[in-house]
A protein has these predicted regions:
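N-terminal secretory signal peptides that target proteins for export/translocation
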Residues: 1-2
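Generic hydrophobic/packing signal
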Residues: 5, 20, 34, 39, ...
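Bacterial N-terminal signal peptides
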Residues: 5-16
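Preference for short coil/turn "hinge" residues that link or interrupt alpha-helices
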Residues: 6, 29-31, 139
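N-terminal active-site segment of His-dependent metallophosphoesterases
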Residues: 18-80
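Extended active-site neighborhood of metal-dependent phosphoesterases/phosphodiesterases
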Residues: 75-158
Length: 158
């Protein structure tokens, strides 16, 4: 799953390099969270609740989740973590990790219903374009992959 986070970061950097650099005084404060593995009632659930409060109190402008929001990708976990994320008072965006796609009991359909996209998201924040997509493995504990259709999507969005 670490490869998908790296790809997300490089994708965002690549996309932003195609546009003029903002003036030196322009800033965008991003909170980036990944692999939070929230399960209702576990320690990650409690820690994430604290993190949401800290982010709300911070000066960050946007929150990005890089995948593995849940531990098992169950419908109950996805509903729970979405409820917690919805407490954020900042704009936020999330892409699924392998725990939401490969390990999921719904094969990512619950993620798509709750989060509003099938694993690809493009958005602007300030002068920046962010492109996020799921690059997780298609079986448990395998290496991530960038699919041909993902590259075509990146090119079309950028």
């Amino acid at each position: 799953m670490k490869y998908s986070k790296i790809l997300l970061c490089f994708g965002a950097l690549w996309a932003s390099s195609a546009f003029p650099a903002p003036a030196p005084c322009d800033t965008l404060r991003v909170a980036f969270l990944t692999d939070i593995h929230v399960t209702p009632g576990n320690v990650q659930d409690s820690l994430f609740r604290v993190a949401v409060d800290e982010i709300n109190a911070s000066p960050c402008d946007i929150v990005i989740f890089g995948g593995d929001l849940t531990n098992l990708g169950s419908d109950a976990e996805l509903e729970s973590v979405h409820g917690l994320i919805s407490r954020l008072e900042k704009p936020w965006h999330a892409v699924p990790g392998n725990h939401e796609t490969t390990w999921s009991e719904s094969a990512c359909t619950t993620f798509a219903r709750i989060f509003g996209h099938d694993g690809r998201t493009a958005f602007r924040a300030g002068d920046y374009l962010f492109l996020g997509y799921a690059s997780g493995p298609f079986m448990k504990m395998a290496m991530g992959a960038v699919r041909t259709e993902d590259l075509a999507w990146l090119a079309a969005e950028a």
